[in-house]
Design a protein with these regions (language model features):
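Structured alpha/beta or helical-core interaction and ligand-binding surfaces enriched in interleaved
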Residues: 1-75, 80-84
Length: 84
């Protein structure tokens, strides 16, 4: 199941919303940044990733849900929740 969400990309993502969807305080980070593959606190990961302004994915610690934020070829941001 994939759910596309609308988000104002000029402001940081809401960590409480994303933690609520992921169902965990901790998440795995998939990105081009220094924390790629690491298990981090969700709020801290979001702060760092927002500042880097790159595409990324956060995967719940149990691997069942994910949050993806990406940019397409026209530099339009898109955000998705994914549930396995």
């Amino acid at each position: 199941n994939v759910k596309k969400i609308f988000r104002q990309f000029e402001t940081p993502p809401d960590p409480e919303l994303i933690k609520g969807f992921l169902g965990s305080e901790m998440c795995y980070v998939i990105s081009h940044g220094d924390n790629d593959g690491n298990l981090l606190e969700t709020a801290a990961a979001l702060d760092e990733l927002y500042l880097n302004n790159m595409a990324y994915m956060l995967i719940s610690s149990n691997g069942e849900t994910a949050y993806l934020e990406a940019e397409n070829e026209y530099s339009r941001h898109r955000a998705y929740f994914l549930k396995g």
